[in-house]
Amino acid sequence: MPKIKSNTPIYTNISTHSNENSKTLIKNKTILELITQKLIIRKSEKEEYGEVFTPLEMIYDMAIKLPKDVWKNPQLKWIDTSSGIGNIMIVVFYLLMDGLKDIDGYKDEQERSKHIIENMLYMIEYKEENVADCKYMFNLLNDSANPNIICADFLDRGEKWKTMFNNKITKFDINIGNPPYNIEGTKHKGIKNVYVAFAIKGLELLNPDGYLVYIHPPPYRISHHQIQCAKENLNAIYTTKQIIYIKMFTVESTKKLMNIMMNVDYIIVKNTNNPNILANSMENIYETTITDIKGETHKLKIIPHMFIPNFGISILKKLEQITRKNGNINIILTSEKHAQIIKGGTQYKNVHGITSKGIKICYSDKPHSLHNKRKLIINGIGSYNYVLYDEFGEFGFTQSPVAINEPSPNTLKLIQSKLFHFIVNATKIIGNNFNIKTTLFLPIIDEKKIIIQNETELYNYLKLTKKEIAMIENKDYYSIPAFLHEEIN
């Protein structure tokens, strides 16, 4: 296998610059028009096959994050296991055409083009229509070359695709793609999170030191988490490898780029052990470059089973270090359903939810185990995690909220602070609901050492910098939800 050197990649954000570069990169206007036309996905195709065509600017932005040496190595093998019409490999083709132009033996444009198409690029696609479109586009690039694209199911247990390429190749150096997220349905229908299987099998295809370059949803950033339906801990798999780069996208930016309502990341994983596992000094650590959901760039030492937040990485790192030392605040998830089972109860009040209009109450004839106990009740469902201090133990609660029983003075200050809402939003990796993993970043603050009086003292205790404090005070990162302290049914 040809050795891939680990030079530092060039990093840029998706911007007008990337958009212009991706468009000018593709010289053939017919190909550019076809790709642009195919970006508009029919609803039926999206639901049945999970099709989402990746825009050129996103592909370009992702591809140039790879080490520069990959574009100058004519021996590397590239694969896209869910290639669609081939738009990702079209961008890769043009980048290789540019990168190999000064390499001896590949200076002739036609010969270079033929070599790239026949010996470097490999594609697997499930839909025959897409395969035909892909072959058509590569024929426009070089009509004497035979592209390596097969119509097959990459996830087929029999792995029939392995016998279908002409040279029977089964190992690759770069696996780049945007695999389907769901198949045979959207929302609550169909097979969910199928991208996890693509990612796991995709890593298995790689030679040592090869690269997985994938776009997919971000649950892999949650530590010790079995992804729904897939029942795999992708965090454990990725973080034990060397993660080169992560870029996060908001729901709004993903909608604009790919016309889907979800947040996604793209991630570059090198198929080698995480060097931080054995690092015995600061000189030996490896830091991953991360562009967070707010567009801020960070360097982070990723260790196995690490939670990777949406933003505020340096702040949450400090919080986690204190949590490891002092322990974390205990968040209670109730399993008591009596408030909804017993109808017509009038004796005991149970908080079912909190909105801006007030506190939603369910009544029961059976007391909750935390009735008559002082506690903090946090709205667990929805965008706003309202905090109610039940000082006199008036309420129980249903399955929707979460609670902190008998909070200490320092816990009260922390949970009622701006910092708490900053942490909650930084850890909302999936949807808008409260993430129980937030407790990783909610440290116990020992009252024997300090009694926190205000947020300034809290910031000083945590040793936050002026820049970090400004981030917490910045309303663009989160909102502090207010609600009427009135009971509603």
Where are these regions (language model features)?
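Selective for proline/serine-rich intrinsically disordered segments
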Residues: 7, 177-178, 302, 365, ...
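Short, solvent-exposed polar/charged micro-motifs at secondary-structure junctions
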Residues: 157-163, 256-260, 341-344, 481-483
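SAM-dependent methyltransferase catalytic region
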Residues: 2-247, 251, 263-279
